[in-house]
């Protein structure tokens, strides 16, 4: 039987490492830009004699998960909120948390590309463009880099997400389909979907049906009723 194992590392004034956790919930969704992780620590966590919670918003968190000690990297991000109750609940966001704090440069383009916009913004992390396209005239009006990515999504259908590669964050941005070209569905009509040798003639008189119903009364007494054909299914 496999045993779930985990390792949680929190870098604050000190580095805290936990090999046990009550629960971990990681959510990845390119529609929302930001991956999230919610950790619930065990009830009896000891903070080495600290009188107050020694971690805070903005501390880096790394999560590894696996079975029987075979751990795989699962998430890296930053604390956004800390629960006050016991057990401690920690909510984290990936590196998009940092991009929410960096100001976007207000620039104007006559014929912008995704790559050019990202290059000009000096993101502070690596980036890769998939499905590079020209998005025409464009003006950056967003206040933060994260808001800019959201603006690109709404304006040109550009999806963005962050992944960790070689221990470093990398922003992926691009379009899933070419602009102005919707995926086409082709339907064929007049075709048999089932081999006619599999079809069988079935008369209503040959179909045997039996229905069983059980009702639980307020006094916990059960009433059973069967209707239909005695040899029905």
Range-by-range predicted roles:
Residues 36, 97-105, 115-140:
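N-terminal export/assembly leaders
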Residues 13, 164-166, 217:
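Short acidic-glycine loop/turn motifs at beta-strand connectors
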Residues 54-56, 72, 107-115, 138-146:
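Solvent-exposed, acidic/flexible segments
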Residues 50, 101-104, 182-187, 225:
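Short, charged, solvent-exposed linker or helix-capping segments at domain edges/interfaces
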Residues 1-99, 194:
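Assembly/oligomerization scaffold segments
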Residues 111-120, 143-156, 208, 214:
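Polar, S/T/G-rich
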Residues 2, 87-90, 94-99, 129-197, ...:
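Short beta-strand-centered interaction patches in the first periplasmic/extracellular domains
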Residues 201-233:
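Charged, gly/pro-rich, cysteine-poor intrinsically disordered low-complexity regions
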